[in-house]
Regions:
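Short acidic/glycine-enriched loop/turn segments that link adjacent beta-strands
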Residues: 33-35, 81, 115-120
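Conserved short beta-strand elements that form part of the metal-binding/catalytic scaffold
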Residues: 27-79, 131-136
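N-terminal beta-strand motif that seeds the catalytic metal site of vicinal oxygen chelate
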Residues: 1-17, 83-85, 135-140
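Amphipathic alpha-helical segments
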Residues: 14-27
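Vicinal oxygen chelate
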Residues: 87, 96-140
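Short glycine-enriched loop/turn motifs at secondary-structure junctions
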Residues: 1-2, 76-82, 116
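Short secondary-structure junctions
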Residues: 24-31, 106-110
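Short amphipathic alpha-helices within nucleic acid-binding modules
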Residues: 18-19, 93-98
Length: 140
């Protein structure tokens, strides 16, 4: 088994897609207008617009009963939101400045950890509150 794609279920689809376009500096592949896009950034990172399916379900189109039951169940369940997306860059100092200049929101200070090996990183949040950790093995 292999992980082929990670989905972010977005409540702010357009804003989240724009955020990742700026951060990743690439255009996504569009598979279904306004339902999901996919970024090729090492592995695949997809942004999924739940409102698209919700609108279709309300019109009773495109889905079987099992999907609708699961979709509605997932809406009511409390979720664990503790996920960190880890991105690597060769030049952390340059990337830190670039991300700050995009003015996408709060950017943490650069942090340093040395447990197994030196590790430098900073965090930003996407419009849905997911943590992006941008890291490097040096900060020169």
């Amino acid at each position: 088994m292999e992980l082929v794609c990670t989905y972010i279920e977005s409540e702010n689809f357009e804003k989240t897609v724009e955020f990742y376009k700026k951060v990743l500096q690439i255009e996504p592949n569009e598979f279904c207008a306004n339902r999901w896009v996919e970024f090729e950034c090492g592995n695949k990172l997809s942004i999924y617009n739940k409102k698209y399916d919700e609108d279709k379900i309300n019109n009773n189109i495109n889905y079987n009963e099992a999907y609708i039951k699961n979709f509605n169940k997932l809406k009511s369940e409390k979720k664990n939101n503790i996920v960190t997306f880890n991105f690597y860059t060769d030049n952390l100092k340059e990337e830190y400045t670039r991300i700050q200049n995009l003015d996408l929101g709060l950017v943490s200070e650069i942090m340093y950890v040395n447990i197994v090996e030196p590790y430098y990183y900073f965090n930003i949040l996407d419009p849905d509150g997911n943590v992006l950790e941008i890291c490097s093995d040096n900060y020169e």
